[in-house]
């Protein structure tokens, strides 16, 4: 199969969809891998490393896309990339379509087959291709939040762990999944006072057992969120409804109850954000202030630590990439019921129910396309 790895073009996105090690695996199975020149440089992978792995280098971006049967990316395609997609091609990347109607319709118009990393499941009901980047984003959320609390960044001038004689900052994490646990773990490690809110009692029990009561666990209700809003210096939004838009859990009215200079970090921004006042930002201009509250809403947080993120991503995606390359998308998805939910768009039709519901579109059962 002809496999293409274009260079990411989203603002400050330095990750690449495939490491040289991954390219070597695919070439060894008889596939042709074409990597856009410079695609791996931001993650510390030189062109020469891809050549040594047997991949072809191509400087012309148009040629990278034109001859591809399978296109591997990291972030959702930007407008100029959507324009390059065509029927007969398979795109495998993070899509987060439920918050992006223009992108969804663009992919439909392309006629391509679009498979999303973030909606593939596993036997335990987890999201195996979202988990590694969620781990990175959760840990980075606390770094970003701690920095945003500095006075020069618009924050209250609070040091997360405090100092002897001065209380540490209070941190609330809304959502106790992979992002939430990693955010809470980082905040705890830095010495903050940490509360995790979640609607799953079994999940809260797991966190209680794992951290031996060193962080507070609270069943998430409107009242519990109100209390966090009033008391906390830093709130991390880590809520996920797989494939669907995130719920708005903190309204603009609630910002008035927060301490001036407090910080909101919205890790759910890829899915539209879980704060009413959230809007996507970039690594170039990561924060803004609404009603005295600092908002950090960078949509590709792991892109800032591209080498770690790229290695973790390839470790997770490579088995699925191999299946697509060896079998073609239909057989690969037919053989694996956990791979099947990854199909979001095919031949002009939406195949993931939550995306269809978000925009009032009809959804096609993906199982009907792979029989």
Name each model feature, range by range.
Residues 118-159, 269, 274-371:
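Adenosine-phosphate binding glycine-rich loop
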Residues 76, 136, 177-178:
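Residue-level detector of alpha-helix initiation sites
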Residues 69, 75-76, 95-96, 221, ...:
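Short glycine-/small-residue-rich Rossmann-like dinucleotide-binding loops
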Residues 6-45, 152-240, 287:
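Glycine-rich phosphate/diphosphate-binding loop of Rossmann-like nucleotide-binding domains
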Residues 2-106, 110:
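An N-terminal-biased, well-structured beta-alpha scaffold segment characteristic
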């Amino acid at each position: 199969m002809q496999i293409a790895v274009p260079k990411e073009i989203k603002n400050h996105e330095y990750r690449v969809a495939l490491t040289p090690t991954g390219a070597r695996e695919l070439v060894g199975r008889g596939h042709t891998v074409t990597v856009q020149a410079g695609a791996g440089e931001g993650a510390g992978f030189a062109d020469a490393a891809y050549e040594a792995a047997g991949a072809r280098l191509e400087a012309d971006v148009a040629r990278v896309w034109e001859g591809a049967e399978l296109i591997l990316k990291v972030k959702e395609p930007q407008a100029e990339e959507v324009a390059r997609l065509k029927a007969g091609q398979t795109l495998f990347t993070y899509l987060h379509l439920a918050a992006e109607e223009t992108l969804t319709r663009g992919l439909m118009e392309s006629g391509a087959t679009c498979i999303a990393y973030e909606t593939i499941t596993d036997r335990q009901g987890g999201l195996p291709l979202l988990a590694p980047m969620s781990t990175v984003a959760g840990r980075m959320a606390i770094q970003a939040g701690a920095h945003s609390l500095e006075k020069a960044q618009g924050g209250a001038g609070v040091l997360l762990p405090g100092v002897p004689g001065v209380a540490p900052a209070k941190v609330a994490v809304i959502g106790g999944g992979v992002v939430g646990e990693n955010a809470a773990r980082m905040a705890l490690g830095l010495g903050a006072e940490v509360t995790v809110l979640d609607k799953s009692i079994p999940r809260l029990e797991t966190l209680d057992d794992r951290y031996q009561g060193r962080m507070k666990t609270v069943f998430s209700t409107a009242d519990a969120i109100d209390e966090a809003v009033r008391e906390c210096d830093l709130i991390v939004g880590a809520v996920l409804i797989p494939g669907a838009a995130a719920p708005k859990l903190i309204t603009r009215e609630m910002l008035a109850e927060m301490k001036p200079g407090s910080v909101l970090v919205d890790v759910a921004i890829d899915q539209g954000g879980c704060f009413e006042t959230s809007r996507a930002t970039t690594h170039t201009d990561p924060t803004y202030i609404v009603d005295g509250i600092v908002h950090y809403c960078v949509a590709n947080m792991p892109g800032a630590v591209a080498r770690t993120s790229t290695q973790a991503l390839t470790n997770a995606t490579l088995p699925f990439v191999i299946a697509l390359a060896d079998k073609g998308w239909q057989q690969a998805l037919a053989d694996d019921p956990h791979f099947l939910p990854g199909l979001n768009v095919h031949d002009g039709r939406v195949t993931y129910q939550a995306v269809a519901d978000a925009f009032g579109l009809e959804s096609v059962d993906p199982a009907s396309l792979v029989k």
